[in-house]
C-alpha cells in the first residue's frame, strides 16, 4: 500500500464550525454482545428477519463485499443512499454557507450544482469546448479554480459526453491541489471504460474522494446504493454527519444476494455486451444522414447531435431518450442510453426510418 504524501487536507478544510463536532451516538453504535436488547426502544417482537431491530449504521457484510469488489480496505468505504447522498455529505462537511465554492467542468452531472445550491455554496464551472472534443485542458482547469474552492468534481467517464479523464491527468490535478481542495472523482460509469479506477491511489493522495454506484453496470438503480471511497480519516468524518441508519436491512440483504459469484459473472458479461452494443450503435448512427455530430463514448450512452429535432418523434415510437437542450441550448442534441440487443435494434430501425424521411425533404 502506498503511503499518504499529504496529510493536511482532511482536518484543515473541514468547516470550522464542525471541527469539534460530536456525532449522534445511536443505540446500535454500542459495540457489545447481548441476548436481551432493551436500549433502542424497538419493538421486542422478533421475526426471522429481525426487522424489529435497527440495521447496522454501516452494514459490515455489505461493506466488506464492496471492499473486495473495489479492491480497497473496508475502512476506506462508506455506503450511502445513492451517490447523491455522498455528494451532499461532502458539501455539508467541507463548505461553509455563502463563503466557500465548488468547481466542475460542464456539461456534467447536474446534481453537483443542485447540492451546491442547497448548501448555499457558489458553484463555478469551466465550459468544455466542443472543438476540443470535450476534453479537459489541465492548465486551463487549474487556472480557473478559485482560491476559496473546497470541492472539485470530475466525472469520468463524463456524463453526458462519455469522455474519460486519463489517470495521469487526475494525478496531476491532485498534486497541484494538495492541501487546498478536495478532488471528487465520480466513477459512476467506470466499468464501461478502459481507464483504471483512481480508487487504486486513494492512499497516495489525501485529497482524493472516489464515488461509485451500483445503479449503472450493476443494474441496481432501484436499490439506491452509492459508495464513497477515500482515506479512513475522511470516512470517520463522513460517518459523523451521516444519518444513523441509512441502509435498510432489506436493501443490504437484496444487494448481497445480487453480488454473489454467479451474479457478478452475469454482470461482467452484461458489461461486455453493453460495450459491443455501444460500438454497434455508434457505427449505425455514423451511417445516418440525419446525424450531424457523433461523439465516441466510454460510458453506457452516446451523445448525438441530429440535423433536426427528433426527441418527440422517438417518443411517438415509444422510445424515450434524454434531451440535452439544457446543456447545449440545442434541442437536437440527445443522450441515448445503450439498451438490450432487441431495444437497440428497434431504436436503429426507427432512426433509419427518420433518416430516410429527412433525406427526402
UniProtKB/Swiss-Prot annotation:
SUPFAM superfamilies, per the entry: PLP-dependent transferases
Known catalytic reactions: L-histidinol phosphate + 2-oxoglutarate = 3-(imidazol-4-yl)-2-oxopropyl phosphate + L-glutamate
The EC number(s) this enzyme carries: 2.6.1.9
Superkingdom of origin: Bacteria
GO BP terms: L-histidine biosynthetic process
Residue list for modification N6-(pyridoxal phosphate)lysine: 216
Keywords tagged on the record: Amino-acid biosynthesis, Aminotransferase, Histidine biosynthesis, Pyridoxal phosphate, Transferase
PANTHER family: HISTIDINOL-PHOSPHATE AMINOTRANSFERASE, HISTIDINOL-PHOSPHATE AMINOTRANSFERASE-RELATED
Subunit structure: Homodimer.
Family, as annotated: Belongs to the class-II pyridoxal-phosphate-dependent aminotransferase family. Histidinol-phosphate aminotransferase subfamily.
HAMAP family to which the protein is assigned, alphabetical: HisC_aminotrans_2
Name of protein: Histidinol-phosphate aminotransferase
Amino acid at each position: 500500500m502506498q503511503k499518504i504524501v499529504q496529510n493536511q487536507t482532511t482536518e484543515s478544510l473541514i468547516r470550522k464550525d464542525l471541527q469539534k463536532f460530536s456525532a449522534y451516538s445511536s443505540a446500535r453504535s454500542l459495540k457489545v454482545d447481548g441476548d436481551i436488547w432493551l436500549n433502542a426502544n424497538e419493538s421486542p417482537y422478533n421475526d426471522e428477519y429481525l426487522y424489529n431491530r435497527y440495521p447496522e449504521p454501516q452494514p459490515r457484510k455489505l461493506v466488506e463485499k464492496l471492499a473486495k469488489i473495489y479492491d480497497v480496505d473496508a475502512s476506506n468505504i462508506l455506503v450511502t443512499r445513492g451517490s447523491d447522498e455522498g455528494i451532499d455529505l461532502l458539501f455539508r462537511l467541507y463548505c461553509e454557507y455563502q463563503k466557500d465554492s465548488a468547481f466542475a467542468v460542464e456539461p456534467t452531472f447536474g446534481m453537483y450544482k443542485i447540492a451546491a445550491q442547497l448548501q448555499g455554496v457558489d458553484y463555478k464551472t469551466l465550459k468544455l469546448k466542443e472543438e476540443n472534443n470535450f476534453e479537459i485542458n489541465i492548465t486551463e482547469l487549474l487556472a480557473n479554480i478559485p482560491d476559496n474552492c473546497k470541492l472539485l468534481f470530475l466525472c469520468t467517464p463524463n456524463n453526458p459526453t462519455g469522455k474519460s479523464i486519463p489517470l495521469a491527468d487526475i494525478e496531476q490535478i491532485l498534486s497541484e491541489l494538495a492541501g487546498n481542495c478536495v478532488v471528487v472523482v465520480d466513477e459512476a460509469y467506470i466499468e464501461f471504460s478502459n481507464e483504471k479506477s483512481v480508487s487504486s491511489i486513494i492512499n497516495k493522495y489525501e485529497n482524493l474522494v472516489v464515488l461509485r454506484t451500483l445503479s449503472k453496470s450493476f443494474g441496481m438503480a432501484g436499490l439506491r446504493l452509492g459508495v464513497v471511497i477515500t482515506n479512513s480519516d475522511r470516512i470517520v468524518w463522513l460517518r459523523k454527519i451521516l444519518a444513523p441508519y441509512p441502509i435498510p436491512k432489506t436493501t443490504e440483504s437484496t444487494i448481497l444476494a445480487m453480488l454473489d459469484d454467479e451474479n457478478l459473472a452475469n454482470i461482467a458479461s452484461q458489461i461486455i455486451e453493453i460495450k459491443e452494443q455501444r460500438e454497434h450503435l455508434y457505427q449505425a448512427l455514423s451511417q445516418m444522414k440525419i446525424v450531424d455530430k457523433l461523439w465516441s463514448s466510454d460510458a453506457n450512452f452516446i451523445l448525438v447531435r441530429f440535423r433536426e429535432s427528433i426527441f418527440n418523434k422517438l417518443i411517438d415510437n415509444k422510445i424515450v431518450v434524454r434531451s440535452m437542450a439544457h446543456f447545449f441550448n440545442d434541442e437536437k442534441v440527445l443522450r441515448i442510453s445503450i439498451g438490450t440487443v432487441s431495444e437497440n435494434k428497434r431504436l436503429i430501425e426507427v432512426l433509419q426510418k427518420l433518416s430516410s424521411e429527412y433525406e427526402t425533404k
